[in-house]
Amino acid sequence: MAPRPLRWILPALLLLAGWSESRAQEHGVLLGLRYEEPIPKPLPYYAGDADSLSRAAYRTLLITKSDETFVVWPEENDLLIPHGNTFWRAGSKRSIYNNWVEDFVWAAPDDASPSLVGIQPYNGEFCEGHRKQSVLYASPQFLSLDQQSAGYCEGAAHPWFFNTLAVVPLDSTTHTGLSIADVLGEAAYEALENGVKSFLDGLENERRAAYIEEPDAANWGLARREGRWSTLGRLEAAETATRSASADVPLALDLPPAFTGPHPSSLLWTHIQTFAPDAVDAFVAPEADWLILLRPDHLAIHPVADGAIGQVALTVPVAPGTRAVMVQWAVDAPLRRWVEHVDRHNRQSN
């Protein structure tokens, strides 16, 4: 299980009352995290690369600031994604059919049961292998998924290995993937073409031949890189029987705020790394007056004044290898709705 956040800061009901009466600007962030959850017993089935005794799991933390007070609210299982005045929830479900294993990503309104896709009978009856999805990015409109599949079916000439990216609508996790141009415009597809060309031009002919040179407009994604959201394209292997012959290509593309949220320019990644050389990621508040550092085994919350990072105010333990997949900021009334929702859900669960 992932380490639990700090629940003892203040009783939730007292905090909620204080927030309702506060006149100071209140701002906070819903932070969605992906980590590897151990499986407590050996797997009784063939799973290829997925046979790691772990699977992707997700948790959401609401962290708020009012005046100089920081609060880490009780965590939510899965990804709690703000969607207008309501919430959606996204997570992962492992399914097993004989020697075939699939980790599905699902999404549904928070007050509804998710529709879980089952394994196709042919795969379960005649194939051995796995298909694994994991979330790289989550927003009110889209999910960015990393998809891996490997296996062998009876009568096939050889095994297969696929590593692809897909950006799908939040309400359609079975979608095969949206074109980068449909989501970000034609200039984004040009950035994909240019990025792939630059990458291939830097390879020797023998290595270059390992890839399909024409980029797939739907094989792209969003992920965290140096404290920001960035776009990347994935080049597919020219031969599907070749293991791991795919390559991720960063794209020279400025994402609009609708995808990234605000990011103050006063705190550069180089400055953050000077302060914390082991920082994995950083999340800077819209007013640049506080930030959260993701370090190898914990989150560290720091005040910021005049561009200078202050001493740590709170820490939250995280599992090794934790990565951020959602960063959603809010202030005042929208944030109070988030606080009320998380507090109400926590009281209903206890």
Report each predicted region and the residues it spans.
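Hydrophilic extracytoplasmic domains
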Residues: 249, 253-350
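Post-signal peptide N-terminal segment of secreted/secretory-pathway proteins
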Residues: 46-134
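Acidic, serine/threonine- and glycine-rich low-complexity intrinsically disordered segments
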Residues: 129-278
